[in-house]
Amino acid sequence: MSDTGSSGATARAQSDDRTLAFVVYAMHFVAPFVFGLTALIGVAIAYVRRPAAEPVLASHYRFQIRVFWVGFGLSIVAALAVMFGMGMIVWELAGAFLSDLPTDPTEAVTRNLDVDLPVAAFVSLIIASCAWIATALWMIVASVAGALRLSAGRGIRMKAERP
């Protein structure tokens, strides 16, 4: 009788682990819309649950961790590109405004700033936009694909694991 109770507890634990893996996929899916906060919680869950999970679920937790780190890397690229582009624009505007300051207050109000903004600033902002879009698509598509494989009871084989 203890075997039946033990196998029931094991089945329940596997079911809970499977449900938790679905929850992590949902957190990854929502992450682009909430600035990645749910992905951070999801990857923490995946790191904690992976060692004790059965092989199929462990493969999903490994995949969820990889999805997080790829998304995080793309987000860093986007953030750096935004900082570079905005920094160049602010630098150019500050330089144009602060050079040759007028002494008459009325002249300061009517002054026309003729600024040539650097093309590199706009290119970096375009790169940032592309990186944000790539991050969102990666998080959404990878989480949907993983959830579909999990619902079918199939594991995820990553390139490093293939023979």
Predicted feature locations:
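Membrane-interface elements of multi-pass transporters and channels
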Residues: 48-52, 84-100, 150-154
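Membrane-interfacial helical/loop segments at transmembrane boundaries in membrane proteins
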Residues: 93-117
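Intrinsically disordered, low-complexity regulatory segments
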Residues: 2-5, 11, 92-96, 122
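Hydrophobic alpha-helical transmembrane segments in multi-pass membrane proteins
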Residues: 19-40, 66-95, 120-143
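Membrane-interface extramembranous regions at the lipid-water interface
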Residues: 2-31, 44-68, 110-114, 143-163
